[in-house]
């Protein structure tokens, strides 16, 4: 009897607590609807676009008021001037430096509240820097992630020197392009994401290198400023040219503040004097690729003439250094039209005229350039150099596919000993990005990351296959993931870690920038059969945390189902009327009251504005009749 009484008493207390919890939730829901109904149109859109409304019943009215005040006051700006002028933050500021890879997840969680943020970190020889730019009014979202991997075998002090001189340039380029994007709608050239792998035979001591080039280099830069000829620009060392090609549009004011060491000052002066001539080379991304390839080829030829054959071979045996930089830029297509390959650009213009105002579309360009210094030693004669400059890119291989709304273009070309791999992916965003970066169900963010990682994997596949082909007779290779067009294949949550192959006496390239990302079992089998491939610190790059955080898996539908903010806002709205007293919203099952705002769908069904907006961000049909809110032609957002 006593046990039965105690059990009954416990169940009564449990049911009472559940009843109280339900009552509290109902009170919070009522307060939520009251708060939303009292918001004006601007405040409502501000909170909705920044994902601050949350779920009814799970957030109190006081918390909603606090969020509204916080977003109105504005987030603490990351001070663009401070980012430009402080070279310390580029190489990992102590306040932002974090050895924990999960810190980038915290940064992503704060994007929806802070708007524009910058975060950087470093772990061992790998450093990363992430920049977010959001515009709640237009819906544009730009996410840039730079991953720098420095590996050396020999002098352990060289990575820090090279990083201190390279990272400020990369950061200045990023900030400069951001500023131009906000002030002018004109496209900016350096938004093409580049990953350059340059391998050379450097001198054995960094001090010796600085002394040997200072007098001749200054005279060469003076001649370059006068003549603006690519022949005179080419005498910079390959690593310096890699920096110059990735930050050609750095303005003089930003680079002056980045002076720190003597090595950095040499790099800054080179950028300042070459900034005028670099503007002439900005046409299309393909034109810039060929000009950069020609400069790199001629520069290595000049170096090989100034050094003897024995010196070059002995330096190659004693020391080798590889620097890899991977930058991913996601931006609005209107500001990226000039930096896209011609195949995608022509189709973009054709669709632009037919659709009118479009929602934001993310364009992702991934470029990997692999320089093979061994090829340059065979081009020491004037005849060979002339032939390499005049040859046409007749060995370009291009593959284009479209499936599930994703247009993907792959191309591989070789000119003057420089192989360029380009993967362009156009990602339409048909749903609102304000579903929250902190929610693992964000299909849009999952799709973006999957496409980024797949792009790295396909470029890596290109480079793997080209290792076994003759450089003089390349064969067309199509990535296995692109042949069937399977955009929803499983992507393993692994980062684009650097791939290191065992050194061979014949092949001069020993490292590549790619991705340990498999999009099919065939690719995994192909990579495993090669053998001898090792991955260094695969878990230390932020992409591992990103992939795990967003739970990338093949069960998600790559085709976004919801409507964009612009499409939702174009639907008609009205205020509560006398005839609405006994009507009920079918989403929240709540009667309309005085002060409610109602949104009317084309099928004539009406709902609370905040209720139907949340529904339409995930769906494109009416909750009652299941009719499409927009016709297929109006929902098309591929540009």
UniProtKB/Swiss-Prot annotation:
The keyword Zinc applies. Coiled coil: none annotated. Keywords: Developmental protein, Metal-binding, Nucleus, Transferase, Ubl conjugation pathway, Zinc, Zinc-finger. PROSITE patterns: ZF_RING_2. Pfam families: zf-RING_2 (PF13639). GO terms for cellular component: nucleus. It is found in: Nucleus. One of its GO terms (biological process) is protein ubiquitination. PANTHER family: E3 UBIQUITIN-PROTEIN LIGASE RLIM (PTHR45931:SF4), SI:CH211-59O9.10 (PTHR45931). This is E3 ubiquitin-protein ligase RNF12. The gene is rnf12.
């Amino acid at each position: 009897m006593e046990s039965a009484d105690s059990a009954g008493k416990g169940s009564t207390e449990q049911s009472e607590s559940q009843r109280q919890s339900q009552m509290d939730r109902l009170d919070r829901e009522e307060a939520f609807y009251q708060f939303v109904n009292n918001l004006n149109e601007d405040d409502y859109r501000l909170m909705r676009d920044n994902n601050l409304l949350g779920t009814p019943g799970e957030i109190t009215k006081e918390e909603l008021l606090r969020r509204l005040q916080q977003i109105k006051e504005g987030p603490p700006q990351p001070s663009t001037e401070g980012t430009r002028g402080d070279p310390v933050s580029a190489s990992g500021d102590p306040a932002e430096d974090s050895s924990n890879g999960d810190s980038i997840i915290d940064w992503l969680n704060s994007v929806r509240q802070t708007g524009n943020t910058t975060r950087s970190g470093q772990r061992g020889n790998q450093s990363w820097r992430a920049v977010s730019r959001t515009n709640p009014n237009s819906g544009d979202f730009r996410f840039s992630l730079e991953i720098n991997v420095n590996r050396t075998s020999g002098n352990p002090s060289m990575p820090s020197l090279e990083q201190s001189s390279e990272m400020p340039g990369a950061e200045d380029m990023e900030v400069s392009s951001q500023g131009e994007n906000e002030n002018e709608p004109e496209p900016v050239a350096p938004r093409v994401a580049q990953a350059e792998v340059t391998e050379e035979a450097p001198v054995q001591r960094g001090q010796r290198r600085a002394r040997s080039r200072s007098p001749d280099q200054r005279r060469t830069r003076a001649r370059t400023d006068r003549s603006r000829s690519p022949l005179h620009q080419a005498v910079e060392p390959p690593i310096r040219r890699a920096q110059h090609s990735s930050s050609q549009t750095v303005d003089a004011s930003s680079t002056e503040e980045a002076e720190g060491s003597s090595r950095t000052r040499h790099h800054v002066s080179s950028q300042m004097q070459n900034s005028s001539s670099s503007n002439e080379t900005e046409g299309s991304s393909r034109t810039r690729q060929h000009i950069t390839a020609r400069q790199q080829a001629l520069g290595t030829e000049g170096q090989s003439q100034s050094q003897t054959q024995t010196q070059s071979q002995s330096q190659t045996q004693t020391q080798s250094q590889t620097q890899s930089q991977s930058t991913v830029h996601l931006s609005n297509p209107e500001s990226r039209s000039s930096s896209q390959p011609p195949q995608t650009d022509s189709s973009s213009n054709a669709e632009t005229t037919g659709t009118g105002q479009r929602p934001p579309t993310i364009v992702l360009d991934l470029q990997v350039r692999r320089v093979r210094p061994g090829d340059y030693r065979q081009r020491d004669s004037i005849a060979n150099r002339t032939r390499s400059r005049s040859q046409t890119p007749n060995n370009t291989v291009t593959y284009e596919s479209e499936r599930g709304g994703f247009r993907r273009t792959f191309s591989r070309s070789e000119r003057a000993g420089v192989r360029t791999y380009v993967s362009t992916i156009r990602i339409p965003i048909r749903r609102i990005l304000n579903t929250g970066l902190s929610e693992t169900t964000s299909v849009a963010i999952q799709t973006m990351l999957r496409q980024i990682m797949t792009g790295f994997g396909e470029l890596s596949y290109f480079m793997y296959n080209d290792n076994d082909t003759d450089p003089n007779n390349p064969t067309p290779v199509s990535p296995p993931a692109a042949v069937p067009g399977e955009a929803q294949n499983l992507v393993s949550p692994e980062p684009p870690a650097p791939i290191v192959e065992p050194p061979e006496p014949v092949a001069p390239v020993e490292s590549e920038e790619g991705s340990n990302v498999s999009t099919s079992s065939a690719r995994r089998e192909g990579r495993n059969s090669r053998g001898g491939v090792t991955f260094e610190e695969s878990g230390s790059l932020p992409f591992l945390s990103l992939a795990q955080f967003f739970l990338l898996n093949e069960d998600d539908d790559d085709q976004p189902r919801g409507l964009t903010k612009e499409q939702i806002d174009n639907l008609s709205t009205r205020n509560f009327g006398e005839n609405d007293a006994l009507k009920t919203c079918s989403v929240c099952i709540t009667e309309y009251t005085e002060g409610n705002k109602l949104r009317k769908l084309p099928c004539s069904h009406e709902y609370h504005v905040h209720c139907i907006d949340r529904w339409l961000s995930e769906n494109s049909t009416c909750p009652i009749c299941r009719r499409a809110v927009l016709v297929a032609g109006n929902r098309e957002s591929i540009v």
